[in-house]
Curated annotation (Swiss-Prot):
IGPS catalyzes the conversion of PRFAR and glutamine to IGP, AICAR and glutamate. The HisH subunit catalyzes the hydrolysis of glutamine to glutamate and ammonia as part of the synthesis of IGP and AICAR. The resulting ammonia molecule is channeled to the active site of HisF. Residues 3-209 form the Glutamine amidotransferase type-1 domain. Heterodimer of HisH and HisF. Keywords: Amino-acid biosynthesis, Cytoplasm, Glutamine amidotransferase, Histidine biosynthesis, Hydrolase, Lyase. It comes from Geobacter sulfurreducens (strain ATCC 51573 / DSM 12127 / PCA). Pathway: Amino-acid biosynthesis; L-histidine biosynthesis; L-histidine from 5-phospho-alpha-D-ribose 1-diphosphate: step 5/9. This is Imidazole glycerol phosphate synthase subunit HisH.
Length: 209
């Protein structure tokens, strides 16, 4: 049985996520086969690009039902960047598009004209920023409040239930930077690009039962 399956649906630099797991001692398999996902102990859904394209590719690749099934069965599941956004109900990126609706909520665009310290904030939000820890999932055991992590995104999550928010970040607005619900942990930031902090998340996820 594959221990960690990284879903390859044509969206994102999956090799960097795979290398992140390798650095902390875990073998992760990049797969475009839904059957491998169904057989895996832990599942990772990365994602870079437009929400609608990511969702379409998941559907065309036959991944939607396997993802919903492994989540229902309680297997550890990690969503990264757009992979986190896809877990919500819908996104307003390029229209209104339905997501997996595992976490009720919406994906919104950063408002225009945001300012901080007298300077206009550019969209996308790109670079290092601080986390404010609200709840600490097992994968965040070594993530300190105020830890710096790496973001690249123009849209952010707004879960209906604030109790699922594990961490927030502020960029013009305070937004949800990480989600934790049961067996699901998801990050808007890229743990594979977040140096020691991010690698600790991958390591602790790999150790989840």
């Amino acid at each position: 049985m594959t221990k960690i399956a990284i879903i390859d649906y044509g969206m994102g630099n999956l090799r960097s996520v795979q290398k992140g797991f390798e650095k902390v001692g875990f073998e992760a398999v990049v797969t475009a086969d839904p059957k491998v996902v169904l057989e895996a102990e832990k599942i990772v859904l990365p994602g870079v690009g437009a929400f609608r394209d990511c969702m379409r590719n998941l559907e065309q690749g036959g991944f939607v039902e396997p993802i919903l099934r492994v989540i229902r069965e309680g297997r550890p599941f990690l969503g990264i960047c757009v992979g986190m956004q896809l877990l919500l109900t819908d996104s307003v990126e390029f229209g209104l598009y339905q997501g997996l609706n595992v976490i009720p909520g919406h994906v919104l665009r950063f408002p225009e004209g945001m300012r901080e310290g007298g300077e206009e904030l550019k969209v996308p939000h790109m670079g290092w920023n601080q986390l404010s820890i609200k709840r600490r999932p097992p994968a965040f055991a070594e993530v300190e409040d105020g830890a710096n992590v790496y973001f690249v995104h123009s849209y952010y999550e707004m879960p209906d239930d604030e109790s699922v928010i594990a961490a927030t970040c502020t960029y013009g607005v305070e937004f949800c930077a990480a989600i934790w619900k049961d067996n699901i942990v998801a990050t808007q930031f890229h743990p594979e690009k977040s140096q020691a902090v991010g690698l600790s998340i991958l390591k602790n996820f790999g150790e989840m039962k």
